[in-house]
Amino acid sequence: MTTRYLLDKSAAYRAHLPAVRHRLEPLMERGLLARCGITDLEFGVSARSREDHRTLGTYRRDALEYVNTPDTVWVRAWEIQEALTDKGFHRSVKIPDLIIAAVAEHHGIPVMHYDQDFERIAAITRQPVEWVVAPGTA
């Protein structure tokens, strides 16, 4: 079985770096990278103009499979956040990352990331997450 990943912006934004590009390009070529609603919004923030926003949207729609965000994801994100309070991490983990992790967990796919938040979440959920490259190298 081939693993498909939910691509977080923390990994995608580093695609200009050779090691990250080397990791992501084969996955993209094989259609193994996915997006969800919240990742689309995160990418939209980086647009410098309306035209750039449209270009980013078209690129993401063409390049990445879309996985939906069912209503149960919001409940699960709340549960994860609540569990993070026990470790004192509920304020340090970004809300979009909670949602992305819950979407990935719902669909049974790992998050491809470059963000410690997903490691903190996975310590609670035991879901698979993967650094796009080793931490500290990008």
From Swiss-Prot:
GO biological process, one term: negative regulation of growth
Domain of life: Bacteria
Residue ranges constituting the PINc domain according to the UniProt record: 6-128
Names of required cofactors: Mg(2+)
Listed InterPro entries: PIN-like_dom_sf, PIN_dom, Type_II_TA_system_RNase, VapC_family
GO molecular function: magnesium ion binding; RNA endonuclease activity
Gene3D superfamilies on file: 5'-nuclease
Enzyme class: hydrolase
The keyword Magnesium belongs to this UniProt entry's keyword annotation: yes
Record-listed Mg(2+) binding positions: D8, D97
Parts forming coiled coils: none
SUPFAM superfamilies: PIN domain-like
Keywords (A to Z) from UniProt: Hydrolase, Magnesium, Metal-binding, Nuclease, Toxin-antitoxin system
Enzyme Commission number(s) of this protein: 3.1.-.-
Family: Belongs to the PINc/VapC protein family.
Main function: Toxic component of a type II toxin-antitoxin (TA) system. An RNase. Upon expression in M.smegmatis inhibits colony formation. Its toxic effect is neutralized by coexpression with cognate antitoxin VapB21.
Matching PANTHER family: RIBONUCLEASE VAPC2
Protein name, UniProt field: Ribonuclease VapC21
Organism annotation: Mycobacterium tuberculosis (strain ATCC 25618 / H37Rv)
